[in-house]
C-alpha cells in the first residue's frame, strides 16, 4: 500500500511539473509595412496542449497561431520552471532571413558566403522578455496552416538562446556573472547530413550598449582558428558546447564574467550566439548598487537648555550608489505623548561628494527649534531611503537632554566614584610626601 501511495505521489509530482508554466504565450507579430512604419498583429505560441485538439483561436490569423514543436525541449523547459506569480512575458515575433555573420571575426563560421538551400523557406524570430527570463528562438513554420481539426500552423524550434538573469543587480566592486545558455537542432536531416558529426562551430559575442552603439567586450569562436578581438575590461566567457552527440540536439554555454564592476559598466548588455547563417540574441540590463551607511553627529547626546535650540544635527550618508533616489527624513521619537512625528526645524542637503570607487556621499542637516522640558529624553532620528535598501530604510538617532532635568546616570556615578577614588589617593600621596619631608628636616637638624 505504501508503494502504491509513493507511486501516486510521484505521478502527481510529475504531472504538476509538466503542467507548470503557461501553455500559451500571446505574442505580437511585428513587420515593416513598406516605409509606413511598423505594424503589429496579434499571434500566439501554443507550447503545450492537453489531450485532444488544440484550442481554436478564430481571433488570430492561422499563420500566426503556432503549434510549437521543440526537439531540444529547451524552450519548453524554460517555461516549465516559470513562476506562477510572475507576469506574462512580453513576446514579439518577426521575419528572419538566414545570413552570414557580419563581423570579420565570425567569418570562419561560414566559409561559403551563399546560404545553403537547406535553410530556404520562411523563418520567424521570437523574442520574449520578463523579470525572470530573456529569450530568443528561431522557428521554422510549415508553409501552410493545418486545416483540420483546428486552423493552426506547425512550427519547429531550431535555435533558442536564454538567460535567467535578465536584470542582474551587482554590488559595486563585486564580480558580475551573467548566465547564458542555448540549444540547437538542425532544421532538416539534409542540413544535419551536410555537416560533420557533432555540434557545429559557433560564435559568442557580448556587447554593452552605450549611446546607441554596441561596445564589443568579448568575442569567441571555440574550436576555430582565427584572430579574435582582445577581451575588454577583464571579461571572461565560459563558451562551449555541453555535449557532443553526433546529430543533435545540442546545448551550449556562453556565461559571461565581469570582474569588480564599476558604475560605468551598468547598462544594456547584448549576448549573441552565431551559428552558420543563424543568430539568436538576448538583452540583459545590468544595475550596479551600493547601500549607504548612515551616522549622526553629535553621536549620542544633544544638550540644550529650556528655550534654547540644540546644536545643529549632521546626518552623514556615505558611500552609496546610484546617486539618485536618496531621501533623507528627520523624525522626533518619544516626544510629548510618546509618539514619533516629523521633526521641525530648518533642513538642507549638501552637494554630492564623489569617491574613487564611483560611490558618492552627502550630508543632511537639521537645525532643531528651541526645546521644551517635555522633550527631555526624546530622540532625533535621521532615516534614509534608497533603492538599494529595504522599504523601511536605515536610520541613526541621538538623544536630546534638556539641561537641569537629568539626574546622574550610571556612567556619571561611576565617573564620580573614580574621581573621588583618584582624589583620595592623591591626598594620601601628598600626606605621605609631607610626612617624609618633615622627617628629613628633623633628621638634618639633629645631625647639625
From Swiss-Prot:
Q: Which residues are glycosylated?
A: 253
- Lumenal side of membrane: 21-414
Q: Which residues lie on this side of the membrane: Cytoplasmic?
A: 436-448
Provide the site residues for: May be involved in interaction with TAP.
428
Where the record annotates domain Ig-like C1-type, the positions are 292-399
- Is Transmembrane included in the keywords of this UniProt record? yes
Signal peptide range equals 1-20
The membrane topology term of the UniProt record is: Single-pass type I membrane protein
Q: What is its main location?
A: endoplasmic reticulum
Its subcellular locations are: Endoplasmic reticulum membrane
Query: Which cysteines are disulphide-bonded?
Result: 27-91, 315-382
Q: Where are the transmembrane segments?
A: 415-435
GO cellular component annotations, sorted alphabetically? endoplasmic reticulum membrane
Please give the biological process terms from Gene Ontology that the record holds.
antigen processing and presentation of endogenous peptide antigen via MHC class I
Give the matching Gene3D superfamilies: Immunoglobulins
Q: Tell whether Transmembrane helix is among the UniProt keywords.
A: yes
Q: Keywords for this entry?
A: Disulfide bond, Endoplasmic reticulum, Glycoprotein, Immunoglobulin domain, Membrane, Signal, Transmembrane, Transmembrane helix
| Known partners and oligomeric status | Heterodimer with PDIA3; disulfide-linked. Obligatory mediator for the interaction between newly assembled MHC class I molecules, calreticulin, PDIA3 and TAP. Up to 4 MHC class I/tapasin complexes bind to 1 TAP. Interacts with HLA-G-B2M complex; this interaction is required for loading of high affinity peptides. On its own or as part of MHC class I peptide loading complex, interacts with ligand-free MR1 or MR1-B2M complex, providing for stable MR1 pools ready for metabolite antigen processing.
Domain text: The N-terminus is required for efficient association with MHC class I molecule and for a stable interaction between MHC I and calreticulin. Binding to TAP is mediated by the C-terminal region.
Described purpose of this protein according to its UniProt entry = Involved in the association of MHC class I with transporter associated with antigen processing (TAP) and in the assembly of MHC class I with peptide (peptide loading).
Q: What is this protein called?
A: Tapasin
State the species of origin. Chlorocebus aethiops (Green monkey)
Q: State the taxonomy lineage.
A: Eukaryota, Metazoa, Chordata, Craniata, Vertebrata
Amino acid at each position: 500500500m505504501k508503494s502504491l501511495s509513493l507511486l501516486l505521489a510521484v505521478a502527481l509530482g510529475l504531472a504538476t511539473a509538466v503542467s507548470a508554466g503557461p501553455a500559451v504565450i500571446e505574442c505580437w507579430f511585428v513587420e515593416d509595412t513598406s516605409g509606413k512604419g511598423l505594424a503589429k498583429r496579434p499571434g500566439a505560441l501554443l507550447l503545450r496542449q492537453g489531450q485532444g485538439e488544440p484550442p481554436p483561436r478564430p481571433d488570430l490569423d492561422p499563420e500566426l497561431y503556432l503549434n510549437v514543436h521543440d526537439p531540444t525541449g529547451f524552450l519548453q523547459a524554460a517555461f516549465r520552471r516559470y513562476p506562477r506569480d510572475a507576469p506574462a512575458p512580453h513576446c514579439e515575433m518577426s521575419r528572419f532571413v538566414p545570413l552570414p555573420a557580419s563581423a570579420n571575426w565570425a567569418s570562419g563560421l561560414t566559409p561559403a558566403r551563399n546560404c545553403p538551400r537547406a535553410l530556404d523557406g520562411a523563418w520567424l524570430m521570437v523574442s520574449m522578455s520578463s523579470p525572470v527570463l530573456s529569450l530568443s528562438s528561431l522557428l521554422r513554420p510549415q508553409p501552410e496552416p493545418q486545416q483540420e481539426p483546428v486552423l493552426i500552423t506547425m512550427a519547429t524550434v531550431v535555435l533558442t538562446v536564454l538567460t535567467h538573469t535578465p536584470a542582474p543587480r551587482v554590488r559595486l566592486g563585486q564580480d558580475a556573472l551573467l548566465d547564458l545558455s542555448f540549444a540547437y537542432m538542425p532544421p532538416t536531416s539534409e542540413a544535419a547530413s551536410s555537416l560533420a558529426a557533432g555540434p557545429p562551430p559557433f560564435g559568442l559575442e557580448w556587447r554593452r550598449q552605450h549611446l546607441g552603439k554596441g561596445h564589443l567586450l568579448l568575442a569567441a569562436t571555440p574550436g576555430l582558428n582565427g584572430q579574435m578581438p582582445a577581451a575588454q575590461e577583464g571579461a571572461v566567457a565560459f563558451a562551449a558546447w555541453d555535449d557532443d552527440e553526433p546529430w543533435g540536439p545540442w546545448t551550449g554555454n556562453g556565461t559571461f564574467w565581469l570582474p569588480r564592476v564599476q558604475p560605468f559598466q551598468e547598462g544594456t548588455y547584448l549576448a549573441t550566439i552565431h551559428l552558420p547563417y543563424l543568430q539568436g540574441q538576448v538583452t540583459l540590463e545590468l544595475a550596479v548598487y551600493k547601500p549607504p551607511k548612515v551616522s549622526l553627529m553629535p553621536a549620542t547626546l544633544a544638550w540644550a537648555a529650556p528655550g534654547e535650540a540644540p546644536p545643529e544635527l549632521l546626518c552623514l550618508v556615505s558611500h552609496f550608489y546610484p546617486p539618485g533616489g536618496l531621501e533623507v527624513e528627520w523624525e522626533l521619537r518619544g516626544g510629548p505623548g510618546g509618539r514619533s512625528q516629523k521633526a521641525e526645524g530648518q533642513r538642507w542637503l549638501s552637494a554630492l561628494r564623489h569617491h574613487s570607487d564611483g560611490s558618492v556621499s552627502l550630508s543632511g542637516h537639521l537645525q532643531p527649534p528651541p526645546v521644551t522640558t517635555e522633550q527631555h529624553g526624546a530622540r532625533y532620528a535621521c532615516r534614509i531611503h534608497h533603492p538599494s535598501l529595504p522599504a523601511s530604510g536605515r536610520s541613526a538617532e541621538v538623544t536630546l537632554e534638556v539641561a537641569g532635568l537629568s539626574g546622574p546616570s550610571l556612567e556619571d556615578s561611576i565617573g564620580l566614584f573614580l574621581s573621588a577614588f583618584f582624589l583620595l589617593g592623591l591626598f594620601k600621596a601628598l600626606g605621605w610626601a609631607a610626612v617624609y619631608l618633615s622627617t628629613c628636616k628633623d633628621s638634618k637638624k639633629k645631625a647639625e
